């Protein structure tokens, strides 16, 4: 017996040694190839792009999330994780070869310099932006902190440009983009990302501004994630001290993360919205809430991005994100959905399959048990909602054509070419006055009809669709004039099928308890 064990150990050690020797030979082979190439190729060879492509090709054969990052992109990524960006503080769209400002961040250098929404930027430092792509324009507008650029701007119907000097500076970012009250004492908060280290504090502040509420809807749709620490701290707000939030399973190290205190909102009824773009840190939060029977998840199956990447810095300032472990929800579910190494195209395409229950065969999925009430929850990658909402689509042909033609922004810009926001507020000083009294003028309606029929010449008359399209434009104008969130207040919660389902459930806390398996 002892001799057999010694023989087995010897064979295992030899196997490891042979494997290590083989790996070393492959590395030497690669080094020898590049040295020979550099010394003997007929022309002088720049190795930098070749090495970059080799790294990218290698990583592409692994999991879908290991990737190479250029030095420039790595610098921007670090800025995003610090919660601050350097720039002028605007976002913009390209409309008919023109760069048009669609958002000016409050307190940003652009806001202080007088840039306004719907301004057309025709040049930066005498370099024309007419006809350039949004990515090219973004490159021209970027710069180091403290540098100054002159924007040439056309405003409204005035042909003479304005020249505005802007000094680039740090721009604090917000993770919570919307927070408001719906009917029946239901609060609504939309979290766009988990990139900010102060997300939990920002979230708490926004919820407290809502006053006394009986239930809360957290919208995580299209939230691509961010920091693990932010997901943990947000989860703590809704859990009891000692509750498991997430664990990791890796080749070299495993970790577990628990709530360090009783959460301020641990007794607040909670509904969470997810879709196929809800990923990473947002899935950690949603998974913890579902596993502890703290929230009803509504919408679509989430993306299923549950791999942990470690950033490895390379000497030239670039880096690689290398997958080192997997995230597990408190019940032991793997968040990462299945993938085939090297097949990233199918991986990205498949996420769109999970937008309704019919495409998800629950009977084929591994089942788990929730931690408080023992109800059945499903694994197999991503967070499966407790209530699936199948989107029926916008059946009205005119509305569908309007959205597909991407003409809404053009119509909004044309309206504000004729009247500025201050004049608008003089006429409609409150949102209530605007909602009751404002109607689109004939010029805006004709432009909308023209754009829709240019997109689809065969479209027949659709009076109901035309009326709904006017409501959509009206709600978008409200967003421009009265601030972020007003679109949802006057129209969005009626149009948004997922939000409507969430509101119906949140309006009845007893239904939340029933769905979560509580017995009263």
Identify the function of each model-found stretch.
Residues 1-24:
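Bacterial Sec-dependent N-terminal signal peptides
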Residues 19-26, 30, 34-42, 46-47, ...:
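Cleft-lining beta-strand/loop regions that shape enzyme active-site pockets
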Residues 281, 293, 304-366:
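Polar, glycine-rich mid-to-C-terminal structural blocks
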Residues 103, 132, 165, 323, ...:
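Short linear motifs in exposed loops
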Residues 122-123, 296, 321, 336, ...:
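Hydrophobic beta-strand signal
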Residues 334-335, 339-520:
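Conserved functional hotspot residues or short segments at active or partner-binding sites
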Residues 41-102, 148-178, 230, 492-503, ...:
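Extended, small/polar residue-biased N-terminal targeting/export presequences
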């Amino acid at each position: 017996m002892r001799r057999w064990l010694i023989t087995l150990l010897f064979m295992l050690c030899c196997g490891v040694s042979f494997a290590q020797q083989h790996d070393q030979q492959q590395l030497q082979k690669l080094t020898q190839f590049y040295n020979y190439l550099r010394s003997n190729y007929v022309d002088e060879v720049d190795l930098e792009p070749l090495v970059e492509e080799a790294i990218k090709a290698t990583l592409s054969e692994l999991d879908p999330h290991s990737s190479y990052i250029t030095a420039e992109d790595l610098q921007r990524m670090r800025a995003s994780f610090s919660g601050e960006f350097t720039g002028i503080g605007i976002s913009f769209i390209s409309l008919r070869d023109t760069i048009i400002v669609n958002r000016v961040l409050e307190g940003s250098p652009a806001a202080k310099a007088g840039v306004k929404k719907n301004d057309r930027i025709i040049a930066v430092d005498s370099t024309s932006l007419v006809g350039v792509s949004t990515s090219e324009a973004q490159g021209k507008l970027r710069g180091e902190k403290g540098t100054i650029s002159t924007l040439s701007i056309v405003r409204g119907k005035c042909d003479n440009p304005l020249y505005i000097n802007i000094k680039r500076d740090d721009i604090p970012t917000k993770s919570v983009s919307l927070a408001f009250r719906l009917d029946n004492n239901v609060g609504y908060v939309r979290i766009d990302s988990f990139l900010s280290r102060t997300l939990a504090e920002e979230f708490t502040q926004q919820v407290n501004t809502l006053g006394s509420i009986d239930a809360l809807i957290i919208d995580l749709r299209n939230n691509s994630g961010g920091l693990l620490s932010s997901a943990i701290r947000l989860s703590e707000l809704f859990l009891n001290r000692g509750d498991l939030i997430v664990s990791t399973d890796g080749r070299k190290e495993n970790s577990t993360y628990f709530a360090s205190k009783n959460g301020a909102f641990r007794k607040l009824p909670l509904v969470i919205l997810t879709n196929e773009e809800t990923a990473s840190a947002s899935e950690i939060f949603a998974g913890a809430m579902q596993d502890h029977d703290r929230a009803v998840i509504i919408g679509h199956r989430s993306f299923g991005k549950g791999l942990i990447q470690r950033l490895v810095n390379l000497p030239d300032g670039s880096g690689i994100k290398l997958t080192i472990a997997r995230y597990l929800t408190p019940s032991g579910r793997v968040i990462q959905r299945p993938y085939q190494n090297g097949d990233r195209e199918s991986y990205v395409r498949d996420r769109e399959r999970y937008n309704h229950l019919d495409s998800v065969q629950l009977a084929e999925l591994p089942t788990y048990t929730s931690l408080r009430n023992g109800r059945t929850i499903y694994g197999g990658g991503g967070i499966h909602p407790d209530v699936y909402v199948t989107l029926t689509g916008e059946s009205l042909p005119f509305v569908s054509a309007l959205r597909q033609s991407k003409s809404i922004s053009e119509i909004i810009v044309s309206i504000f070419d004729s009247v500025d926001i201050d004049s608008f507020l003089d006429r409609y000083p409150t949102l209530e006055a605007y909602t009751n009294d404002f109607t689109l003028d004939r010029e805006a309606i004709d432009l909308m009809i023209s754009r829709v029929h240019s997109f689809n010449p065969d479209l027949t008359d659709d009076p109901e669709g035309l009326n709904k399209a006017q409501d959509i434009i009206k709600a978008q104008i409200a967003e421009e004039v009265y601030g972020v969130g007003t679109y949802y207040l006057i129209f969005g919660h009626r149009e948004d099928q997922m939000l409507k389902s969430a509101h119906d459930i949140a309006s009845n806390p007893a239904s939340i308890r029933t769905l979560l398996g509580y017995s009263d």
